[in-house]
Amino acid sequence: MKAPGSRLQVSATGRAIIALLFVFSVGPILSALPFELAGELDAAGLRQTLARQKGRVVLLNFWATWCVPCREEFPELSKLQGKYGAAGFQLIGVSTDFAKVRPAVQKFLAEQRPSFPNYRKKSGGDDQDFIEAVDSSWGGELPFSVLYDRSGKKVRVYSGSLPLAAAEKEIRKLLAAR
């Protein structure tokens, strides 16, 4: 087969080789980009991140790679984002893993391929200030989720695994309220 406008002939084998080169060189780069951590958050960064979401219903979820319930609910959280994202819902994940295990966090995100941004809680700083920015009742248990309405008002706190059916019902209710 001749390439258009060229005297060069490309065989079926040549086309297959070109396709494989594209898949193995560009494909992995493109597929890895969305699954990087969006950054690190301290209390001020968390407040700013939430403030930027005004007008959207937000579920803020704290997790860690060593937390089995966190790992189990993660795929369901991604489904929630996929299902309600276009309607004005935004899920934001925050890993509480220490900086030294960042490669494990990156690996987990690459495996899970989440449809929502994920941050890591910044190490050091004032942990009490961070807890106050999240919810003063939070004792550090994981998973831990906080649901906000479109105005940024805290509506519900979920300590432990997210009760998916109840949370989804609450999300639908908040999305319907204008």
Indicate residue ranges for each PLM-predicted region.
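Conserved redox-active cysteine motifs that mediate thiol-disulfide chemistry
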Residues: F62-K79
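Bacterial N-terminal signal peptides
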Residues: A16-P28
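A short beta-strand-turn-helix
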Residues: L37-V58, Q81
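Short pre-active-site segment immediately N-terminal to redox-active cysteine/selenocysteine motifs
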Residues: R56-V58, F62-W66, F98, E141
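Sec/Tat signal peptide C-region and signal peptidase I cleavage site
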Residues: P28-P34
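Thiol/disulfide oxidoreductase modules built on the thioredoxin-like
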Residues: Q112-P114, K122-E170
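Structural microenvironment flanking redox-active thiols in thiol-disulfide oxidoreductases
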Residues: F74-R113, G125-E132
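Short, basic, low-complexity termini and linkers enriched in Ser/Thr/Gly/Pro
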Residues: K2-G14
